[in-house]
């Protein structure tokens, strides 16, 4: 299912899948006819109790993402390991408030968290700040809008281009923006930051500068190349 021009969501049928938690990921390995192997990690996009979904962004000159976004066909088989990870996991039992800050496809694990939060009907307050280049680049744009309610606040910042009449943020995430959207340190939020390495490092530093304890800021990052 296409999310943007360069991003697709895949639903996978995995034999003996043990189930997963929001914030975990899987490793996918492809093997060519000559034996060459390439492996990449992808965040799980679906909530627990549902079919495994991955949202993949096409990376130019990538070794795995072109196959997953452009070549894969129903019935294809490949190696998958997972679910992997526990550090970046969030479950409703952990409470809130939640602050989720995403850069580009870093929003993928947050979809799983928000869908679980919405399904649980838990009144945990969640604030989502999603940074994208332009409005057409916003992954899960309609779905995030549909999830927004009294308990889930969704905000966007568009760093390169904005549609006519745009009245939201139009710059990179900075300390002032994070202070405006809250929650602040006094609320002791659980904070998750995901995106490209420079984005994650800048946001994490800004959050600590605002007074958030470093131990409360969980980060997951990916490099500018690969795929």
Protein language model regions, located:
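Short, glycine-rich nucleotide/cofactor-binding loops
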Residues: 97-107
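Conserved S-adenosyl-L-methionine
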Residues: 116-126
């Amino acid at each position: 299912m296409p999310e943007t021009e360069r991003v697709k969501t895949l639903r996978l049928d995995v034999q003996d899948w043990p189930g997963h938690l929001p914030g975990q990921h899987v490793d996918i390995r492809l093997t060519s006819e000559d034996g060459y192997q390439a492996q990449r990690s992808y965040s799980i996009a679906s909530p627990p109790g549902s079919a495994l979904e991955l949202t993949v962004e096409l990376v130019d000159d990538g070794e795995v993402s072109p196959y997953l976004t452009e070549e894969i066909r129903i019935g294809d088989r490949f190696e998958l390991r997972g679910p992997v990870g526990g550090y970046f996991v969030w479950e409703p039992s952990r409470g809130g408030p939640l602050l989720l800050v995403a850069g580009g496809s870093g929003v993928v694990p947050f979809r799983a968290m928000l869908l679980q939060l919405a399904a649980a009907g838990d009144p945990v307050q969640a604030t989502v700040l999603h940074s994208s280049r332009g409005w057409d680049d916003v992954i899960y744009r309609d779905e995030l809008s549909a999830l927004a309610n009294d308990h889930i606040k969704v905000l966007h910042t568009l760093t390169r281009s904005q549609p006519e009449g745009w009245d939201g943020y139009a710059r990179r995430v900075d300390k002032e923006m994070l202070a405006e959207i809250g929650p602040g340190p006094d609320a002791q939020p659980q904070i998750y930051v995901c995106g490209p390495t420079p984005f994650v490092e800048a946001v994490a530093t800004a959050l600590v500068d605002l007074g958030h304890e470093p131990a409360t800021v969980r980060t997951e990052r990916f490099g500018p190349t690969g795929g």
